[in-house]
Amino acid sequence: DWAMHFTQGSEFAFRSLWITNHPLLVGAPYSYPFIVNWISGLLVRGGMEFFSAFVVPSYIYSIVFVFILTLFYRVVFRSRGIAMLATSIFLLNGGLGFWWYLIEIKNNLSLAAIFGSRQEFTHFGEKGIEWISVITSMIIPQRSFVFGFPIALCVAILIYKEIQKRHKDWSVKRFIIAGLIFGALPMLHTHSFLALGIILACWFFTPFIHTKHKKESFFHPLFCWVAFGATALIIATPILLTFYRTTIVATTSGSFIKWFPGWFVNQNGEHSEMNWIWWWFLNWGFTLPLGIVGWFLMPKKKKLIIAPFFVLFVLLNLFLFF
C-alpha cells in the first residue's frame, strides 16, 4: 500500500495541493480518501525529508489510534479494565491460526520456527484463515484507516455521550459538530464513513425505543438528529460528487454492491467447501460466540448501542462490496 501512498503524496508535494484526476490512471477521477497523503505532501513542501513525512505521521497516528480506541471502549463500558481487554482483543485478533503455529514449533523446535516463521498464521488461506491481523493488514499499511478510523470513533463517542442523557439535555451544538466531522469522513476514510453511517442510523432509534424516557418529548432529540444529518449532508455531498461520482453510479447500477451470501464460503467464494459457522469459528475463535452471549446478558440500553455492530456483521456476510 505504501507505494501507492508515496505516489499520491508525491502528487501533492511536487505538483498541486488540489487534484481531481487520479495520479496513476490517466483520465480517471481521484476517488481515494486523500487527506492523509495531502498532509504528508504538505510536510514535504514545508521542508521535511520525503520518507519521514510519511513514517513520522503514521507513527503518531498509530499511537492516537490505540488511545482513541481504548477511550471509546471506556466510554461505552465505563471500565478501564474492560477497555484495555477490548482493545487487546481488537488489536490481537487472528482466530485460531495460532494452532498451526504451535504445530510448526512442535515439529521444529528452534528459534527460527518460533521467531522467524515464513507463514502468516492470521492469513493462512489453505486452512481457511482469512481474518488477517489488524496490525499487519490495516494499521501499518493502510494510512487512511489509521488516520480516519480514530476520527470516526470520536464522532461515535460524541454522539454516544449525548444519547445517554435525558432527551432535553441533548446538545444541538454537539450534534452539529459531530455532523461536520462525519460529513468530512469521505476524505479521511470512506469505509469508516459508511460503517459509522449505518451505526448512527441505528442509534437514531434509541430515544424512541428506550422505555426510560417515554414521558419525554421526542421533538428535541429528533431536532438534534436533523441538525446532525443536515450538517453532514451539506459537507459530504460536494465531496462525494467530486471524488466518488463513479462509485455512486456503480452503486446505483448494482456493480459496486453484489448479493454474495456467505462471503468466503459463498458457492463462488474461496472456501465454498467449508461450513459457514466453522469458517467464522476458525477466523474469530471464541470471540464471536462469547460476544453473542455477552450481548444477551447486557442491559437493554446497552443492547441497543451494540446492536448496530451485529447489523454490520450481517450485511458483510450477505453483500460483497467491490
Please describe what each predicted stretch is:
Residues P141-V155, L233, K258-F321:
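Alpha-helical transmembrane segments at the extracellular/periplasmic loop-to-helix junctions
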Residues F147-G148, A152-K173:
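Membrane-interface transmembrane helices that cradle and orient dolichyl/undecaprenyl
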Residues T136-I139, R174-H189:
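Membrane-interface alpha helices of multi-pass inner-membrane proteins
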Residues W170-F182, I199, W225-A230, P299-F322:
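Transmembrane alpha-helix segments characteristic
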Residues A156-I159, A195-H210:
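Hydrophobic transmembrane alpha-helices of multi-pass, membrane-embedded glycosylation machinery
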Residues D1-I151, T190, L194:
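Active-site lumenal/periplasmic loops and adjacent helix-entry segments of GT-C-fold
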Residues L85-I89, L180, H213-F243:
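Hydrophobic alpha-helical membrane-interfacial segments at the cytosolic entry of transmembrane helices
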Residues T122-M138, I248-W278:
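Juxtamembrane membrane-water interface segments that cap and precede transmembrane helices
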